[in-house]
């Protein structure tokens, strides 16, 4: 039986501490749309998305009204387009991206992901077509998101893909305002198939025909809970985070089950990730500072983040039988008001953020760098992050934005959930010769599991 104080606590979490469901994401297979004619394929994709997702937004709104739980985004993820379009006789997949964009707008969702390729061991012709289509596709669509998986613990890092993605990010930044197209492009190592968060979501080939995945949020709730244990031991800190994560995940489970029932689509997973926003009171950085750091980014930050990430998982696992996605704590610089501030103050650098990615979800996320940064330097940043993921058997990623005509200390405004970011310093050295070697970095010895 529910107690009055538990009901009031939940209301307080939603009204005062920015607790919300960050996204309901419909994962959708497009395998049955395959066709040699790219025009016919685009039409099939449009028809399938609009038919399957026609009630997604309405369902989310109904759940919001019924339970009083804010659901910030409704999204769609689809099978990686390089697989779906492999039989097409064409040179570019721009028309497919436009069909995805049009369909997503028709059903009213915020983003659609899956304009993606999986090239961790090598390229197919279709993979290369998709990657070469990325700059114009991101420039000519509004809500299409893309991802490319360039490495894995099992197979190593495809350095040819790393080089190509550095060049692709650079080109995309030059043909989209303030490099904004790069905010819709993620480069992964060890990408997961059931991620509900953008821009890296795609519907994996091992997934069902269609599925509902939910991503929760709630850093403000965790910070409020930690205020009650100031000065206490780390055991109490971890226990407090675990209990809070359980409550947050339970809410996500409720929303996922309800959406699944209303849409008659199987429930997939709840992603436990703490996802910040630029709003005050909704920051992962402030959670770390609440543990006793004067500034997010100072010494001790990586340890605090490791504790947070692990405790979130332990608490969330007890609240749902199906936990998946990325599940941890996100550190997107432009989307976290504390990290924006500490980047301006010099406490958060790319090097420190890279260290933090060793112990949390994903990687270098929503980081703005000078527009003059070379493609090979971007590739070097991707390679470093991929190496962390490969060696540690975890998902890492890079979503980095070279901003044309901006330099260190300038500010770029993206707006909405994407926030704003100071232009961060990159190393003045170069890695041109390293990146130009090509080939594949071999998988680590612990990849041999059999």
Curated annotation (Swiss-Prot):
UniProt xrefs under Gene3D superfamilies: 3.20.70.20
InterPro entries on file: UPF0210 (IPR007841)
A Pfam family reported for this protein in Swiss-Prot or TrEMBL: DUF711
NCBIfam families per UniProt: PRK05313.1 (NF003700)
UniProt cross-references to HAMAP family, sorted A to Z: UPF0210 (MF_01221)
Subunit structure: Homodimer.
Family: Belongs to the UPF0210 family.
Record's protein name: UPF0210 protein CPE1497
């Amino acid at each position: 039986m529910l107690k009055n104080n538990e009901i009031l606590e939940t209301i307080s979490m939603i009204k005062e501490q920015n607790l919300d469901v960050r996204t309901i994401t419909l994962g959708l297979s497009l395998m049955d749309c395959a066709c040699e004619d790219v025009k016919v394929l685009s039409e099939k994709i449009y028809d399938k998305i609009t038919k399957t997702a026609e009630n997604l937004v309405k369902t989310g709104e109904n759940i919001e009204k019924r339970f009083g739980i804010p659901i910030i985004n409704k999204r769609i993820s689809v099978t990686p387009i390089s697989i779906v379009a492999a039989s097409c006789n064409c040179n570019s997949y721009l028309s497919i991206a436009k069909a995805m964009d049009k369909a997503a707008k028709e059903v009213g969702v915020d983003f659609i992901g899956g304009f993606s390729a999986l090239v961790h061991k090598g390229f197919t012709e279709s993979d290369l077509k998709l990657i070469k289509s990325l700059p114009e596709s991101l420039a000519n669509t509004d809500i299409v998101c893309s991802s490319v998986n360039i490495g894995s613990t099992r197979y190593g890092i495809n350095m040819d893909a790393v080089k190509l993605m550095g060049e692709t990010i650079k080109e995309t930044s030059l043909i989209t305002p303030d490099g904004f197209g790069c905010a819709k492009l993620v480069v992964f190592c060890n990408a997961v198939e059931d991620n509900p968060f953008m821009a890296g979501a795609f519907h994996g080939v091992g997934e069902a025909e269609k599925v509902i995945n939910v991503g929760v949020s709630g850093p403000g709730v965790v910070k409020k809970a930690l205020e009650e244990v100031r000065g206490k031991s780390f055991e109490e800190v971890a226990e407090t985070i675990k209990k809070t994560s359980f409550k947050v995940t339970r809410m996500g489970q409720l929303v996922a089950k309800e959406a699944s029932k209303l849409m008659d689509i199987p429930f997939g997973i709840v992603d436990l990730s703490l996802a910040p926003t630029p709003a005050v009171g909704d920051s992962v950085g402030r959670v770390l500072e609440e543990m006793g750091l004067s500034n997010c980014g100072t010494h001790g930050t990586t340890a605090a983040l490791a504790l947070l990430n692990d405790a979130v998982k332990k608490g969330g696992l007890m609240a749902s039988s199906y936990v998946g996605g990325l599940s941890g704590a996100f550190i997107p610089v432009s989307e976290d008001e504390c990290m924006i501030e500490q980047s301006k103050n010099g406490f958060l650098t790319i090097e420190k953020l890279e260290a933090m990615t060793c112990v949390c979800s994903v990687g270098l996320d929503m980081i703005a760098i000078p527009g003059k940064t070379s493609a090979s330097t971007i590739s070097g940043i991707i390679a470093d992050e991929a190496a962390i993921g490969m060696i540690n058997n975890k998902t890492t990623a890079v979503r980095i934005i070279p901003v044309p005509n901006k330099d260190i200390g300038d500010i770029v405004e993206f707006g909405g959930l994407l926030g704003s970011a100071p232009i961060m310093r990159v190393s003045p050295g170069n890695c041109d010769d390293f990146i130009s070697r090509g080939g594949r970095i071999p998988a680590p010895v612990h990849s041999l599991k059999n």
